[in-house]
Regions:
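Gram-negative (and chloroplast) outer-membrane scaffold detector with strong preference
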Residues: 39-134, 179-182
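Acidic, glycine-rich calcium-binding repeat modules characteristic of RTX/beta-roll
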Residues: 36
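Short strand-turn segments of transmembrane beta-barrel domains in outer membranes
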Residues: 26-33
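N-terminal "first-domain core" detector
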Residues: 23-25, 44
Length: 184
């Protein structure tokens, strides 16, 4: 994590890429309330940055009441045309986090996770430097149990394990991504 912060600091504090002027836009911030990203524009088509967030899911199936995930990671954006125009984009994300599942009996199960997403989608860019991005694609979530706090012996931990195994790889992620961004 320390190395990630050092790399991002160097990118953010460095002068513009050769051939660019300081008046050109250099950063992109996007959000969808649960996920926030901050990226440094490398050139017309590429940006690199980090993402973080906290998501809540009301599951209410298979004895699992809800899930809460906290995560942090790095991302790279490539557009077929440009970052400051309407364009198709490819967005790989790599991150780490924790998910806490709460079952119907009040037990909690905490999982450490390593996430890899490869999103593809479309980015609409507006003249006021706002953008809207929609994407979806495959995901891989490698999760391992860190702890459990049992409130009963009903065996709900097996239901949580089954859910974690089902989400290990999804050809199309169960949640499409919709972001609103600002370039500055």
């Amino acid at each position: 994590m320390k190395h990630l912060l050092i790399i991002l600091s160097v990118l953010l504090l460095s002068s513009p890429v050769i051939g660019e002027t300081s008046e050109e836009k250099q950063f992109i911030a996007t959000t969808n309330i649960f996920v926030n990203t901050f990226s440094y524009i490398l050139n017309k088509q590429n940006a690199v940055g980090f993402h973080f967030g906290k998501g809540f899911t009301d599951i209410n199936e298979d004895n699992i009441e809800k899930g809460e995930t906290i995560f942090l990671g790095v991302n790279y954006t490539y557009t077929l045309d440009c970052l400051q125009c309407d364009s198709i984009f490819i967005l790989p994300l790599f991150g780490r986090g924790n998910t806490v599942y709460t079952t119907n009996d009040g037990s909690t199960y905490t999982y450490s996770r390593l996430d890899i997403y490869l999103l593809g989608g479309y980015r609409w860019y507006f003249e006021n430097d706002l953008s809207v991005q929609f994407g979806m694609g495959p995901s891989s979530v490698n999760a391992s149990k860190k702890s459990e706090n049992l409130k009963s012996n009903k065996g709900y931990g097996n239901d949580v394990e089954d859910r974690v195994k089902k989400r290990r790889f999804e050809l199309i992620n169960h949640t499409p991504f919709l972001f609103i961004g600002y370039t500055f």
